[in-house]
């Protein structure tokens, strides 16, 4: 079976986010928002092949932890998870 997985990878709270700071600066400069607290992340969609839901979730978790994120600096959250 195949599963569609959506993943959001973000910097951990204690890690400085220069891209987020840059967006915050532009928002303040343009008068759109004074302090939006922007944090920049990465969004992934992938298709995982597995025999069942549990195996697919384990495989997606392994992919996220080993390939899509740097566990020292980033955390990830598996969002939508659906059987195709």
Regions found by a protein language model. Give the residues of each.
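Non-catalytic surface loops within mature trypsin-like serine protease
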Residues: 9-13, 50, 82
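Short, conserved charged micro-motifs
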Residues: 14-18, 53-58
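Short amphipathic alpha-helix segments
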Residues: 14-31
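N-terminal glycine-rich anion-binding loops that anchor highly charged ligand groups
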Residues: 33-39
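Long alpha-helical scaffolds
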Residues: 3-5, 50, 56
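Short glycine-/aliphatic-rich beta-strand segments at the starts of folded cytosolic domains
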Residues: 1-13, 42-45
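Short, charge-patterned binding micro-sites
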Residues: 39-52
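C-terminal structural segments of small proteins and small subunits
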Residues: 57-83
């Amino acid at each position: 079976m195949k599963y569609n997985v959506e993943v959001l990878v973000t910097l951990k709270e204690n890690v400085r986010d220069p891209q987020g700071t840059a967006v915050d600066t532009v928002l303040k400069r343009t008068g759109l928002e004074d302090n939006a607290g922007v944090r920049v992340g990465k969004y992934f969609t992938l298709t995982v092949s597995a025999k069942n839901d549990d195996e697919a979730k384990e495989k997606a978790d392994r992919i996220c932890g080993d390939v899509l994120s740097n566990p020292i600096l980033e955390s990830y959250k598996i969002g939508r998870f659906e059987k195709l």
